[in-house]
Design a protein with these regions (language model features):
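Conserved glycine-rich cofactor-binding loop
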Residues: 10-12
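Conserved glycine-rich Rossmann-like NAD(P)H-binding loop of the short-chain dehydrogenase/reductase
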Residues: 24-40
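Conserved NAD(P)H cofactor-binding loop of Rossmann-fold oxidoreductase domains
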Residues: 84-89
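Substrate-binding pocket helix/loop in short-chain dehydrogenase/reductase
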Residues: 92-105
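Active-site helix of classical SDR
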Residues: 116, 152
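Residue(s) in the substrate-gating loop at a strand-loop-helix junction
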Residues: 136
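Active-site loop immediately N-terminal to the catalytic Tyr-X3-Lys motif
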Residues: 143-147
Length: 176
């Protein structure tokens, strides 16, 4: 039984990735803040694909260590880590509340890096696994009114490229 962990799984790319992985018969750990939506997705996936689905209603930016502990305590081996949770803010950079940017960086960068660090070490020990960090075309260029988001996605791209090079030959695939 192979497990995939998907953050930001309650909608959008994360939700679609969960369905694609379930179709491939991966058991799932779905993580997002919106528990009701996660439970609905879980029920639908279990009904359609018959796989095991765990739901964690956690703010990834605050609880990425709790996600790891949940898996360790249940002896769940994560074969695929999909770091999809993230958000952006639209507005003039200097007029935004700095707390918004702090939260964005905590989620888009700090939590992503933390999850890679925790699960990546286990994958290296097993000489297998796949880390997918969801980036954006915004990471390739700067832009007005979302400058911190653009910068956070540039971080994701560059961090992922560096991690891929470090883990080359370790049996762990890393992509963005």
């Amino acid at each position: 039984m192979k497990f995939a962990l998907v953050t930001g799984a309650s909608s959008g790319i994360g939700k679609e990735m969960a369905y694609l992985l379930a179709e491939e018969k991966y058991d799932l750990i779905l993580v997002a803040r919106r528990e009701k939506l996660l439970n609905e997705i879980r029920d639908d996936i279990v009904h359609k694909y018959g796989v095991d689905v765990h739901v964690l209603s956690i703010d990834v930016s605050l609880g990425y260590k709790d996600i790891y502990d949940y898996c360790i305590n249940r002896k769940i081996v994560v074969d695929i880590l999909i770091n999809n949770a993230g958000f952006g803010y639209y507005g003039k950079c200097l007029e935004a509340d700095e707390k918004v940017y702090e939260l964005m960086i905590d989620l888009n960068n700090k939590a992503l890096t933390g999850l890679c660090q925790l699960f990546g070490k286990d994958m290296v020990k097993r000489h297998e696994g796949h880390i997918l960090n969801v980036a954006s075309v915004a990471g390739f260029m700067p832009g007005p009114y979302m400058s911190v988001y653009y910068a956070s996605k540039a971080f994701v791209l560059n961090y992922t490229l560096g991690l891929r090079q470090e883990l080359k030959g370790e049996g762990v695939k890393v992509s963005a």
